[in-house]
């Protein structure tokens, strides 16, 4: 675990009960918010007390995926702007037992670019929520605000669809998150500068991989390498392949796990996949949550399997 000077914890603190999950994706349009809503519903159906947080600051739409007729009057923006003091006070009922929603902060300009002290306050209060699972739906891309939400999670999940752009962006997200985590663990400015330089593929230090980075740090500060290795070992993202249309799409998750091990030196897990079904999007247009409408459908069953795999930290067998 490490903390920045501003007080932001960049790795999760062990808990006996509550878990923070985050659902990210390197690009938009991959069904991430709908998957977050579906997972939240499934977890609540399993008896978990769940708060969904729409952390797509500036582009909140999780309320629509849940079938709410209108955006909630109270949002994360009210907490950020200190209109309320407790983050619990902006959590609203969804109509599903055990599932509440903290809607995103798209109700004021600049929500996506909150200041560092505001971010620290939000993240630290999220850690104190009294529920079984906090499930955060993150925005797309690799902005630091998005990555910092991902890094405080106990379970960080990357959603991909079986398309080259989505796969490339997911890999880029994981690499950026890893380097952001390592920078948070660095204790000297020289080491921080080396890590920051590594984000530029054309950096003067010739750093292309985390192994190159560790070698560069060892030359500068040999005593810092062990702590960075521990951070790398503790970083464990999960992958979910969404909108699967055929058997050939399923191995994409295994390919990402292999790429992370080979090129980034980290352990990751392929947690599961969800098939595409046009009926899902028809439900969205009618403001209905598909998994609640058709719990016996293939996508709903796969979401249930995914929830169990994430709870148990299980990986999809290579035979898939």
Regions found by a protein language model. Give the residues of each.
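G-domain G4 guanine-recognition motif of GTPases
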Residues: 26, 160-162, 184-205, 227, ...
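Conserved ATPase-coupling elements of RecA-like P-loop NTPase cores
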Residues: 112, 138, 142-149
